[in-house]
Amino acid sequence: MGFNIPRGTQDILPGESERWQYVEKIARETCHAYQYKEIRTPIFEHTELFSRGVGESTDIVQKEMYTFADKKGRSLTLRPEGTASAVRSFVENKLFANPVQPTKLYYIGPMFRYERPQTGRYRQFYQFGIEAIGSNDPAIDAEVIALAMSVYRKAGLSNLKLVINSLGDKESRTAHREALIRHFEPRIDEFCSDCQKRLRQNPLRILDCKKDRDHELLKTAPSILDYLNEESKAYFAKVQQYLTDIGIAFEVDPNLVRGLDYYNHTAFEIMSNAEGFGAITTLAGGGRYDGLTEEFGGPKAPGIGFAMSIERLLAALDAENVKVGADEGIDCYIVTLGDKAKDYSVSLLYKLREAGISAEIDYEQKKMKGQFKSADRLNAKYIAVLGEDELNQNQINVKDGKTGDQQAIGLDDFIRFLKTNTES
C-alpha cells in the first residue's frame, strides 16, 4: 500500500525548490539591508498564546487551528501565524532590554491552518514576515511597508497595489465599534451566522467578511476614518507623508481590516492585479499592534509587522510570467573510462567540491556516450574526460560545454583552471 501526502500540503521538489531559494535569498538580503535579524521559534506553542494573541473571536482560533494535547494533557497548537511567537520570544527573552530599539526581527517558515485547500492556499504554508517591536514612530510603519514592497520589486513583480487604513487607537476603535453596533443591530438577522456573532463579540470583524450576501450591507458601514481622534489622524497622516516621500503609491481603504484582533493604527495589504490571476489577489498584509507585549506579560513595547505568503509570491511571478531560480547547471562533469580512472575520480571529485566547484561523476556504470548525455542533462559548463592514458600522462581532457572547444589540462592545474573559468 502506497502513501500520499495529506490534503492541503505539497512536496517542493528539485527544480521548484530553486525558485523558493531565490525569493528567500532576496528576503534575507533585503532584511540585512534594513537591519532585521532572523528569529526561529517553535513550530508549536501553547494554545493560549494564539487564543489570547490572535483573538478568541477570529476565524483562525475558532475554526482553523491544529490543536492537540500532549502526553501530559497540555494543549498545544501548530503555529497559524508568526507574530504571536515572535512577540512571545521578545518578552520571554527580554529583548526589550537591548539598548538599541526597536528590536527588528524576521522569520521564514511553515505555518498551519485548517482551511479549504484551493489554488495557492495550503494547510501547511510558508510565510516570510518581519516584526519591529519597541517603537511607535510612524517612520517605522513606512519602513516596514517599504521593506515588503522592496522584496516584491526585487523578486521581479511590477503589478502591485498597496492599500492602507488606520484602525486608530483604543478610544477611536471604541467609538467606531459603538457606531457599527448602532448601524447594523437593527439588520442583524440579514447577516450570515458568523457575522451575527461578530457583531456582538468584535464588530470590526464583520468588515472582513468574505460572504457575498453581506457585501451590500457592509457598503453602508460607518467609516473608521470618521471616528479617529486627533492623535490617530495625525499618526495616519504622518505615515502617508512618509510613504509619499519614499515614492510608494498607495490607496486608502476605510473598510480594510485585518483578520487578527491585535491590530491598531496602521493596517495595510499588498495586492497583485496581474492579469494572470484573473482577479486582484492579496499577497501580504500587516499592521501595528501596540498592546501585544503587555498581553503576554511584558512591558509596553509598540510593534508593527507583516507576513507574506511565499506560495502567493511565486504564483504572482507566474502570473506576470517572470522566470526565476532556474537551475544554472554544474561546473564540471567527469567522464571516466575504466576502473583506474573511476577510482582516481572519487578523490578528485572530493577535492573539486572542497574547492567550491560543483562537480559530478557517473554512479551507474554508464558507457562513455551515456556519461556525455548525463553531462548534457546536468548542463555542465565543462566536461572532463579521464581514462588510463590521461592518468599515465598526468592530464585530463576538458571540453567547454558551450563552445565545444577541447584542451588537455595537467591534473595539477585542473582545479585552478576550473576555479578561474567558473567563478562568476
UniProtKB/Swiss-Prot annotation:
Subcellular location, record wording: Cytoplasm
Enzyme's top EC category: ligase
GO biological process, one term: histidyl-tRNA aminoacylation
GO cellular component: cytoplasm
Record family assignment: Belongs to the class-II aminoacyl-tRNA synthetase family.
Lineage: Bacteria, Bacillati, Bacillota, Bacilli, Bacillales
Complex and partners: Homodimer.
Protein name: Histidine--tRNA ligase
